Amino acid sequence: MQLNVNDAQAIEVSELTFGGEFNETLVHQAVVAYMAGGRQGSKQQKTRSDVRGGGKRPWRQKGTGRARAGTIRSPIWRGGGTTFAARPQDHSQKLNKKMYRAAMRSILAELVRTDRLVVVQDFAVETPKTKDLLGKLNNMSLTDVLIVSDAVDQNLYLAARNLPHVDVRDVQGSDPVSLIAYDKVLITVSAVKKFEELLG
């Protein structure tokens, strides 16, 4: 299949990488797995056994007329432990390489199908100035965009750093969440070739 390139000749690309069916279930699984992997999982609360004190029973079992109580750190007491206390846990989910690659191919194919993938021969800025990058993006009518190149250009990275709706990644640093989070994905021809190598 062919991909149109801005101000250049169309390029031939792999049908497998850029022309497959959109598998929503698989993409959802990949996104959830990626985001779960970013969770810290260090939340911890104290149960009745973790809270300091509460060893001696507050009053005897019978004869006071009050409800029986064995510890002042019971979850129903003020200052007591938490009933179902959170514990540190690993939220990461396993996703096979084959499934991850298939999800990435599915996302790229959907970007092509919905005209959200903008392919350019090359994209760079001469100086690390946000103003220069903004001018270039405005000329292409791009406001909310992920820029993917073969390797991250330092000037481009510095110029985009202060723009809230612009991100710069290399092919290796691209992930399912970043690819679907932006209105458009601006990608260089060399990055397209690298995606074909990695996902083909």
Swiss-Prot record:
Instruction: Recite the UniProt keywords alphabetically.
Output: Ribonucleoprotein, Ribosomal protein, RNA-binding, rRNA-binding
- Basic residues bias: where? 54-65
Example GO biological process = translation
Please name one Pfam family that this protein belongs to: Ribosomal_L4
Q: Got a GO cellular component term for this one?
A: ribonucleoprotein complex
Which segments carry the region annotation Disordered? 38-68
GO MF term set: rRNA binding; structural constituent of ribosome
Q: Which domain of life is it from?
A: Bacteria
Provide the function of this protein. Answer: One of the primary rRNA binding proteins, this protein initially binds near the 5'-end of the 23S rRNA. It is important during the early stages of 50S assembly. It makes multiple contacts with different domains of the 23S rRNA in the assembled 50S subunit and ribosome. Forms part of the polypeptide exit tunnel.
Q: How does it assemble?
A: Part of the 50S ribosomal subunit.
Regarding protein family, the annotation reads:
Belongs to the universal ribosomal protein uL4 family.
Name of the protein in its database record? Large ribosomal subunit protein uL4
The gene that this protein is the product of is: rplD
